[in-house]
A protein has these predicted regions:
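Glycine-/small-residue-enriched transmembrane alpha-helix faces in small-molecule transporters
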Residues: 1-34, 143-169, 190, 293-298
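Hydrophobic alpha-helical transmembrane segments of multi-pass integral membrane proteins
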Residues: 3-8, 34-49, 69, 124-130, ...
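Specific transmembrane alpha-helical segments of multi-pass solute transporters/efflux pumps
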Residues: 15, 19-20, 51-98, 134, ...
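Hydrophobic/small/kink-forming positions within alpha-helical transmembrane segments
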Residues: 17, 21, 48, 72-76, ...
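Membrane-interface helix termini and inter-helical loops of multi-pass transporters
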Residues: 21-32, 87, 136-146, 197-211, ...
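Helix-helix packing/entry segments at the starts of transmembrane helices
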Residues: 36-38, 75, 79, 94-100, ...
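C-terminal transmembrane-helix exit sites in multi-pass transporters
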Residues: 46-58, 82, 101-126, 251-270
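Hydrophobic transmembrane alpha-helices of multi-pass small-molecule transport proteins
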Residues: 47, 117-139, 192, 247-248, ...
Length: 298
């Protein structure tokens, strides 16, 4: 069961690593309101079809209101803020900030779920913050666009932190993961369609190349499937451990950004990213070493 849970988590990480790059490509031809709303609508339709095919009867009354509330937060608000930030930031910037999730999750997991808290998290946090400082020293951080984009990403980071805890709490109940994910997408669709109606240009024609349309098709599935994989994994993996996997977004995200977008990943940025990865992974590695040493002593 744990192997299946970790496999689901790795699949979710793979999708999330490629998403910033795919969003950057789609934004060349599709405006933010249209992109985020269409993704959510088509994703919810796909998930409802899958749920029906595999034999689940969708019943909002049985599911309850919590998955719908979670969907408003994530992927509703988070996808909107994330894609908006991508209009002014590079793809590599976004994956680095999101990889800091384990620190917030270790603290919040301890407060909410009474999960074990390792003091080594603080040492790892210092390394990660130092790595961020090095990373951002390689760009014009105090430019207006950079400040705006990174500010949005920090808001997105906070929303992701809260949503992970809510997901963990919801998935402790006996609700099928596919129905939780479908409910998330439905409520996210409502929020994002309202945003499109109020702030978007409804008369803006969709003139996208075949490559952009193929990217959009990928983005539809990559919005639905990672949340399903993630929700499935969260039944068996603690919050702190689950968020630790997000460190893999850094090397994968950098690789995709360099290959598909031609982003310049300088040595300064690489050094900063490596420090962040070490800082994020170090608490878990130290804890694993202590456990192995204790077993050897016995």
């Amino acid at each position: 069961m744990l192997i299946r849970a970790y496999s689901c988590m790795l699949l979710a990480i793979l999708f999330w690593s490629l998403n910033p790059v795919a969003n950057k490509i789609a934004l060349e031809d599709i405006a933010v309101p249209q992109l985020v709303s269409m993704r959510a609508v088509f994703s919810s339709i796909i998930l409802l079809i899958i749920s029906y095919v595999i034999g689940y009867r969708y019943s909002p009354k049985k599911i309850g209101w919590k998955p719908f509330a979670l969907g408003v937060l994530d992927p509703g608000l988070t996808s909107l803020i994330f894609v908006t930030a991508l209009t002014v930031l590079s793809a590599s910037n976004t994956v680095l900030i999101l990889a800091l999730m384990p620190f917030s999750q270790s603290i919040l997991g301890r407060v909410v779920f009474k999960e074990d808290f390792r003091s080594s998290v603080w040492f790892g946090a210092v390394l990660a913050v130092f790595g961020l400082f090095i990373f951002f020293s390689g760009e014009q951080f105090f430019e207006a666009d950079s400040l705006w984009g990174n500010g949005l990403m920090m808001i997105c980071f906070c929303l992701f932190s809260v949503s992970q805890l809510l997901t963990r709490k919801i998935m402790r109940a006996e609700i099928p993961a596919i129905q939780v994910t479908s409910s998330q997408m439905i409520s996210a669709s409502v929020v994002l369609i309202l945003y499109l109606i109020i702030f978007g240009d409804m008369e803006l024609p969709l003139q996208a190349s075949s490559g952009t349309l193929m990217t959009f098709v990928y983005l539809v599935f990559s919005m639905a499937l990672p949340f399903f994989f993630y929700n499935q994994a969260m039944r068996h993996i603690p919050v702190g451990m689950a968020s630790l996997f997000l460190v893999l977004i850094i090397p994968l995200g950098f690789l995709f950004a360099a290959i598909l977008l031609g982003e310049d990943i300088t040595w300064i940025k690489t050094a900063g990213a490596i420090l962040v990865m070490i800082g994020v992974a170090l608490p878990h590695l130290l804890e694993s070493g202590k456990r192995k040493f204790s077993l050897m002593q016995k």
